[in-house]
A protein has these predicted regions:
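Conserved Nudix-box catalytic region and its N-terminal flanking loop in Nudix hydrolases
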Residues: 23-61
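Nudix hydrolase/Nudix homology domain
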Residues: 33-38, 108-158
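Residue-level preference for beta-strand/loop junctions
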Residues: 10, 36, 89-91
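Unchanged
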Residues: 45-68, 78-131
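Active-site beta-strand termini and strand-to-loop segments that position acidic
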Residues: 18-21, 29, 96-98
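Conserved N-terminal beta-strand and adjoining loop/helix that marks the start
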Residues: 1-25, 44
Length: 158
């Protein structure tokens, strides 16, 4: 089958850059092997749910915070994980927002939430889940690096 005749599942997700001074909020999730993965607050969109609505919902569950004044930063899209059982077409929105509330995650996969200095974010996000997971793809983290440097683009092909 040629790549032109394949149908890939579509994975839609949204993540939010929450900033406090020179710190970025990251969530800590425990992987199946017991290791800790640091990621941006956010996650998968439900069928029919906009990326903006998914961002608001997921941030509330993963952090306990309420986001307001959601602002679009970037869209990442393209084929991912080619040749693996998780192969998909990804459509990921990145936003920033104002927020209020207390850090109190209710997502059972989240074991912690922490403010991380910008200078330390890149070191933490280099380590993640197994290679078959999209978060391991280094292109997923290029927009975060660019955002922290004040160089975010609106579109990132992956």
């Amino acid at each position: 089958m040629s790549h032109l005749s394949r149908t890939l599942p579509i994975k839609r997700a949204a993540h939010v850059y929450l900033v406090r001074g020179e710190e970025l909020l990251l969530v800590e999730e425990r992987m199946d092997d017991g290791s800790i993965f640091y990621g941006l607050p956010g996650g998968k969109a439900h069928p029919g749910e906009s990326l903006a609505d998914a961002a608001v919902r997921q941030v509330a569950v993963e952090t306990g915070l309420t986001v307001t004044d959601l602002r679009f930063i970037s869209l990442l899209e393209g084929e991912m994980l080619r040749g693996t059982r998780n192969e998909c077409y990804a459509n990921f929105g990145r936003f920033t927002a104002d927020y209020h509330g207390d850090l109190d995650p209710t997502d059972p996969e989240v074991v912690g939430v922490k403010w991380v200095p910008f200078a330390q974010v890149e070191a933490l996000i280099r380590y993640g889940p197994p290679p078959e997971c999209e978060e391991r793809n280094p292109l997923i983290w290029v927009p975060t690096r660019d955002f922290l440097r004040g160089e975010a683009r609106a579109y990132y092909p992956i």
